[in-house]
Curated annotation (Swiss-Prot):
<comment type="function">
    <text>Scramblase that mediates the translocation of glucosaminylphosphatidylinositol (alpha-D-GlcN-(1-6)-(1,2-diacyl-sn-glycero-3-phospho)-1D-myo-inositol, GlcN-PI) across the endoplasmic reticulum (ER) membrane, from the cytosolic leaflet to the luminal leaflet of the ER membrane, where it participates in the biosynthesis of glycosylphosphatidylinositol (GPI). GPI is a lipid glycoconjugate involved in post-translational modification of proteins.</text>
</comment>
<dbReference type="InterPro" id="IPR008429">
    <property type="entry name" value="CLPTM1"/>
</dbReference>
<dbReference type="Pfam" id="PF05602">
    <property type="entry name" value="CLPTM1"/>
</dbReference>
<feature type="topological domain" description="Extracellular">
    <location>
        <begin position="451"/>
        <end position="539"/>
    </location>
</feature>
<keyword id="KW-0813">Transport</keyword>
<dbReference type="GO" id="GO:0017128">
    <property type="term" value="F:phospholipid scramblase activity"/>
</dbReference>
<keyword id="KW-0325">Glycoprotein</keyword>
<protein>
    <recommendedName>
        <fullName>Lipid scramblase CLPTM1L</fullName>
    </recommendedName>
</protein>
<feature type="topological domain" description="Cytoplasmic">
    <location>
        <begin position="425"/>
        <end position="429"/>
    </location>
</feature>
<keyword id="KW-0812">Transmembrane</keyword>
<feature type="topological domain" description="Cytoplasmic">
    <location>
        <begin position="307"/>
        <end position="325"/>
    </location>
</feature>
<keyword id="KW-0256">Endoplasmic reticulum</keyword>
<feature type="topological domain" description="Cytoplasmic">
    <location>
        <begin position="1"/>
        <end position="10"/>
    </location>
</feature>
<feature type="topological domain" description="Extracellular">
    <location>
        <begin position="32"/>
        <end position="285"/>
    </location>
</feature>
<keyword id="KW-0053">Apoptosis</keyword>
<feature type="topological domain" description="Extracellular">
    <location>
        <begin position="343"/>
        <end position="403"/>
    </location>
</feature>
<feature type="glycosylation site" description="N-linked (GlcNAc...) asparagine">
    <location>
        <position position="91"/>
    </location>
</feature>
Amino acid sequence: MWSGRSSFTSLVVGVFLVYVVHTCWVMYGIVYTRPCSGDSNCIQPYLALRPKLQLSVYTTTRSSLGAENNVDLILNVEDFDVDSKFERTVNVSVPKKTRNNGTLYAYIFLHHAGILPWQDGKQVHVVSTLTTYMIPKPEEINLLTGESATQQQIEAEKKPSNALDEPVSHWRPRLTLNVMVDDFVFDGSSLPADVHRYMKMIQLGKTVHYLPILFIDQLSNRVKDLMVINRSTTELPLTVSYDKISLGRLRFWIHMQDAVYSLQQFGFSEKDADELKGIFVDTNLYLLALTFFVAAFHLLFDFLAFKSDISFWKKKKSMIGMSTKAVLWRCFSTVVIFLFLLDEQTSLLVLIPAGVGAAIELWKVKKALKITVAWRGLRPVFQFGTHSESERKTEKYDAQAMKYLSYLLYPLCVGGAVYSLLNIKYKSWYSWLINSFVNGVYAFGFLFMLPQLFVNYKMKSVAHLPWKAFTYKAFNTFIDDVFAFIITMPTSHRLACFRDDVVFLVYLYQRWLYPVDKSRVNEFGESYEEQPKRKPHPD
């Protein structure tokens, strides 16, 4: 018989599977292009004629190119081979206008060898900005001495305080170029809209050809590579890299660039957009496809775990066999981790689930301590419920475990905080405080899970653990291991993902060691409920 709860879960899983199948179909439509089947209305590739080409890169402060005397040639590749990969670093002169928060443009021409680009009717070109505007990243200093080793901080101190919050010109030190090299014959009646805007057609006799498709990979421009342009800067390095690209990958890359641009138009910051760029640029397409499925299932398991966890705690009235200290610690550590990720401006893919988890942990503390809120006018009054004899027995085991842990934990946390204050630079005292807390959580947080393990050991049972929610969270633990290598996140948060694997294995061992026993508790704070004694039968 289907219950309302199981029907809702089945509906969510069903919608999720439909979404995954639909997304796979859409992705297939992006990377696959139907070739021209007949002779009429076909558009042939100009590269199939094997013309001798030349690549030229110019810089100018003007957004539109008027005459050749307004540009500076920074790179000239004669006898350019579209199949040969290369990378070259050149020094670019920075005009005074650009040093004063102006913009510098790069014009990239692909034209016939031996002919100037503006004299070649069969040339193709693209334009890219070499500068962008961003608020400078706050400099980290030694909080005790106030020392900072960078010249950027010295110049920043000379500026008025309100000027530090204003966007300034930053240099993009990388320019990544691609040419689509597939000898693909397009159907003129069904040109893909994404590629069409990059195509330039010419008529050669009775045949229509499309010129080489030149593409700038904007996803390779990362925030971490940007350099502040100072007024004293006269030259800056620019790395120009080239590689061929297939039609399927080109179409996929165009869609990804458009998606990132759309997110920025909807209010996503440059930092959040940069995290998405990192996923695309730093991984190959096969790992990227795996990432999509991993992310989709991570969201599904997050939802199911939150739903199961909330449902279990909503019905909970007893804390027998459950470590209250572990619940309080999980709440504290989850909130600290959320504040830390917020301070580090971590990707929203990591930040939002952490925020939801922190809210749930706060609610679980209210249930664990049996807190009720009564209002006397505008003043809230907090009342705590009473504990049964069995709950007091659990608290005894809990306090015993915490006593031994405190001898080890507190000196380690205090020592780590003092060491980081003396040797590591931070943006502010708040940043140091949050980092000290979160490093304690990440490095020694697993110790706070020991009281629950100790309670399980003393009571010789884990049967009351909500294994459904626990299983969902365990799946996400292994998924987090994959994300630890893909999504940009603080190193300490990355290491904590692998620490959770150890905790999961310990609980599996306890489940095997203490088979079915309905008088035990779980790692997430769930425990069995005390069953009221039934009255004896009259007979």
